[in-house]
Amino acid sequence: MPRAKKEDIFYTLLKDFAARIEDAAVEYVKVITDFPETTSEIPQMKVYENKCDEKVKHIMEELYSSFVTPIERSDINDLALAMDDIVDYMNAIASGLDLFNVNEMRKEGPQMANLTLTAVKDIHVMIDHLPDYKKDTLVMEKAIAVGHIEDEGDLVYQNALRRLFLEEPNGRYTVTWTRLFDQMENLLDACDNTAGVVRSVVLKSA
């Protein structure tokens, strides 16, 4: 296979992966925002997770068999795994709502979910423009934007826990919601970790 074509396969796979993650994020926001009416849609998040696992497997197979890669081999590996973490956390959060018998959504849930969707959309654009990362400033702009979104999420997370402990210091859902909010915060961290890999790629080429 010609060198250019072989290198392009990684960008194609990563772009497709980013698109699937955005699809999952749209479903995730719907599940969180309209919960508990969306309880029946929670299993769909596992479907997205499985599909994304296949994307990672394909990327790793190509990585193993390729002599030439468009960016460092370790960066492609780290990027694929970081992107996979995003969907893993979405599924864990959605499944947790069912597992812990949650019957009411707290207001910070949709706030953090929408921040996640915004971050994922930025990641999608970032990955779409990644082939031109040495010249296209939008790559770094989106990577930095994701970091700012994660900072916003930290504030929502802190306020969510503060309100939870104030209103239900000994309530039955305190432990449950602490865990769920932790995972929501970890989800935004996963988005920033993904952007962080790209920030590193761009800086190494500067």
Where are these regions (language model features)?
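Cytosolic, long alpha-helical scaffolding segments
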Residues: 1-206
